[in-house]
Amino acid sequence: MRSFMVSRGCPYKCAYCFNHKYNMLYKGLGPLHQRMSVGRVIAELRDLKARYPTQFIKFYDDIFVLKDDEWLDEFSERYPAEVGVPFHCLMRANLLTESVLLKLKKAGLASLSMSIESGDDHVRNNVLKRNMSRKTLKDAFALCASHDIPTFSNTIYGVPGTTLDQDIGSLDLNIECGVTFGEFPLFFPYPRTELAAYAMEQGAFDGDFDSLHMSYQAGSPLKCFSKREKMRQKNLSLLSTVCLMIPALRPLVVNILIHLPLSGLYFYLYYIVKAYIIKTRIYPMKLSLKDALRSIWESFTLERFKHTEEAFKQALGGERRR
């Protein structure tokens, strides 16, 4: 799989993202969103294919399509004819129409990312600044399902001022939307973002960014949650991915499993489900046995680090000793 970007910039102001600060830096110096011509995209991707074996493209643009326009028309015609590699891209649910989805599918869309972020309307729209209704989210995911496009969603747990019940409500919205695969990271206060400032104003974070884990999946760094609450958040984060694959497990997960000190076991369940869904539905590729084993080992090692606080402490200790 190769990662690629055709544009830069995002006009939206999600509170957890750097883009609103980035846009302020370049205000008045040009359009917020800039995109390559289709011709240049095709030329670069053809060169990529000529240089390296390429089975799949992941377009990492913040939003791959902002509107149904001539660029998308040209892309949907030329990409399958001149590149012909299945791809994944990121969209906002409020921008997805049937016309846009059909053009992307014609081009070779294999799966699509659309973030939900929270099942609570107040948190999603007033705290995270997503400005999206439940109906908009449900309609967008239903549209993908109707055209057999697997979906990948992100949802944030442990936002300052929220409860475990609200996080469970976020899981429920993912299940209602029929999300194929989802990640449920815990809130992480990135420096100079609006949400980090909000966490400090709430007294939930002391502003010591250097003490944070490198990964937003290791555990909540906030002071407003007890140790037991953080354990439940982490367990729910891991098991929510499993619930999307097997929704019938939801009652067992939220009523019993998240309350048990078994995060280590739940990590393995999470990893198995993630590895299976990612490789078969989200980024489907054919790998040799050697490449498959290498991929499993590398991804497992990375996931274990991202979800383990102790690994970071050891790395940090090594840095300080040097």
Regions found by a protein language model. Give the residues of each.
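Glycine-rich, positively charged active-site loop/lid region within alpha/beta enzyme cores that binds
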Residues: 16-21, 204-211
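Aromatic- and acidic-residue-enriched segments that line the glycan-binding/catalytic groove
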Residues: 193-208
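Conserved strand-turn element in the central/C-terminal portion of the radical SAM core barrel
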Residues: 64, 92, 117-124, 128, ...
